[in-house]
């Protein structure tokens, strides 16, 4: 069977039997149509227990790529934190107790929704309660979502948080959309607005809930809420403690850098803070205490390929680069031997409905160059279905799928020419459900299955009831490498 192999991850494209407001179904996609006719294909599970999340919880890019790259189901931080709260282990956490003993005033920062991709509202509330009951003065800094949940669901979430804070005697200090506070593409002007808000130098209002409603009246949805503070909030002090409740790292790293790094030079800062505590490891370069340490994941797909002396290329545009490197490699940043990484810059637009093709064609070129060079294994992510799906723009999402389809056609042709096997799948769905039955925009991921296509010598059928954790072993089987005991079985 030995062949070189390309693994193509079409982010945010899933299978929805309902064709209404389904951008995948509505798109012109000759490459996909050809794949369905000519290549063995099936459906894979990408949500809930199949990827180590709670039952019914939608999958996400971090979890999906971890599952694909490690070849096993890893119980995610969301599940670990839920257990720690239920068993009252969180309040006994040594690093948390140290911070609460050292700092009288404590700030809780995080995305406040039940999306479960970056955070959970229940984790935010549990942390507020632990800190308040300990006798600390506590400040809540809520980041509104509108992306992993519906665009105006923030009103109910923030109403809930406001009441919770009042009952606990906690200060509801600031409000800001994730567009500003959770940027991951080095748009430092956005993060600066939030930094200044945390310091007490933003627009002041008497009631943050009323401000949110006023923003809706001006057609500003949750993701884009401008950084605003309660008029009674005076800002962070350098001796204060700061706790970040997001368990996913990629959209918190920049904010932590701004608040904590002594070497930061992107803009002038008035204060730098030392007493930070993060829910999980955001970046190995941050020498900060964490609540939930990383679980060690050994014998990942990339490690096995590297140890065998084979070459590999990992490529994506900025928005998904961390997913085909850090997450795919089991939460490790360091470059492996014979591993090449190619980062293609994402377009500098406010939201990707402005440019639905994003940088897909440049990413496609990088893959074709890798095939022509003779890389033994290539993994690539096309971000379009997910990133454009998140905008809620149905027509733009159709164009996004069509751009991916064009790229698939070119890569498949190139792979066949150079006798490469290929596997095509998605980490989760999104753009196949852009509105609900009532006509409300859906910008979040779905819990639908995703397609998988396998073109490799000797493969005529894919086993039933498979998931993302079965892909790594499939790649190793194609490369004719031994499958480690930690991995789940192959797809064929």
Curated annotation (Swiss-Prot):
Record function comment: Catalyzes the interconversion of 2-phosphoglycerate and 3-phosphoglycerate.
Record-given protein name: 2,3-bisphosphoglycerate-independent phosphoglycerate mutase
Family membership: Belongs to the BPG-independent phosphoglycerate mutase family.
GO biological process: glucose catabolic process; glycolytic process
Domain of life: Bacteria
Cofactors: Mn(2+)
Pathway per the UniProt entry: Carbohydrate degradation; glycolysis; pyruvate from D-glyceraldehyde 3-phosphate: step 3/5
EC number(s) per entry: 5.4.2.12
PANTHER family xref list: 2,3-BISPHOSPHOGLYCERATE-INDEPENDENT PHOSPHOGLYCERATE MUTASE (PTHR31637:SF0)
UniProt cross-references to HAMAP family, sorted A to Z: GpmI (MF_01038)
Organism per entry: Campylobacter jejuni subsp. doylei (strain ATCC BAA-1458 / RM4099 / 269.97)
Subunit structure: Monomer.
Enzyme class at the top of the EC tree: isomerase
InterPro entries: Alkaline_phosphatase_core_sf (IPR017850), BPG-indep_PGM_N (IPR011258), Metalloenzyme (IPR006124), PGAM_B_sf (IPR036646), Pgm_bpd_ind (IPR005995)
Keyword Isomerase in annotation: yes
Catalytic activity: (2R)-2-phosphoglycerate = (2R)-3-phosphoglycerate
Pfam families reported in the protein's UniProt record: iPGM_N, Metalloenzyme
Binding-site list for substrate: 118, 147-148, 178, 184, 248-251, 320
Record: active site: 61
